[in-house]
């Protein structure tokens, strides 16, 4: 039991303390979490614990989550506290507050980490069931109930709570201890997160050609909306007959855009619809990027972004003369953990005007000597930040075939971030952003804070986005000294998005599992960020989260999205074409 009375320094224990200790030992058979102001249990036990701990030097506990300095958003669901303590068999958890709130005391025998439920439909020979790492398998956990967590949050607003875990051995006293400090922010997340929920099921087809997902499994891709104050997400779109990919919303949350594959594997369809509780995408809502006669031949839209006011769409276009394999490096692997490398090697930025139906290259980002991609709007719509590199063949002659992510046989490309005026579509001179360019690394996927002050981007050795070595950096939007963000995890940090109030960033990572999860970090007015906070239970344990994006709508602002664009050539012929301007 907890603790062994024979090991106690009896001369220092008063009878009342001994009685209280016996009560605590009985309660520790389960989990007890109380605010101890009224019963006084923690106060009465304090001299007992002090007496036990005094004669010995306590071994350190590895406190894995949350990390010291973590900042939680108000109202988020209770987190799982995770630690490693090889010799402990029971633990006390003591939480004290800088605002003098009533301390919280819990005792527990701990629970081992476990894998959540899997989706049986996404189990395949090409992937493996999620499993704990050796470190995770050695971990112990404690999750406060909703009432206890609410009390912790209420007393830690903008002032750190100190969490102390003390370990005990069966038959002995206190053996180990560690502590962290954590805070609850006053800044709400203020918006739900829209994200793509995908199976990781690479498939080998005819002649051994590998696809990230077999055509027969496309319908397993889901889109979800998550309110972080709720324990589960809500599926808003599923059972798509064709693949749909990158999505974006206008800053006001009124317009939604998404790349959708059309008939004959046409990669040039784009949906633009108003955001409503019940949304429907039909043929009339589709823009066809491809010129007439090129359906199914050319991929001309990539990383499309709706403007802040919803009037324009910015995208990467390779031009009508270049086919997919002439403008993109694409390699797929049977390794489900990192199953694809995909990045453009040629292309220009062009903008589409919804009011005129005209697509026009943007001067300053339309030089065919370069690949210009990943374009994003400033919050006021006055300038564009984008990634640029010298254009090249996706597969130079004699190049070997890459067999895994970060293989030296990948086509090498390092992007630099540039800024160019939009100037009502007239563009201007593109200038490199200091701190995010010409540093020997690949700088990509920029996202500008809603107040226009900060730029968060991905940095990796080669290519962009879903790289094992992807790290998040922050730099002043006009350029300056970059900082590696504290929120970075050990493996793949990417697909980030700012909350509408500019105080939170959501991003994806494979830190805990090859099945990608999403995390939050708080960013203050000076651009300082906090350790990563897991958004738990975003999907099944054997499915991956990508492209999480905050949407400036109420938490229940989208209930469902219906897609009624039939996979038929006749429908494609009826779709509106985006007229070329100077292109």
Q: At which residue positions do the language-model features occur?
A:
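Sequence signature of WD/YWTD-type beta-propeller architectures
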Residues: 30-583
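Intrinsically disordered, low-complexity proline-rich regions
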Residues: 6-9
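Bacterial N-terminal signal peptides
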Residues: 17-28
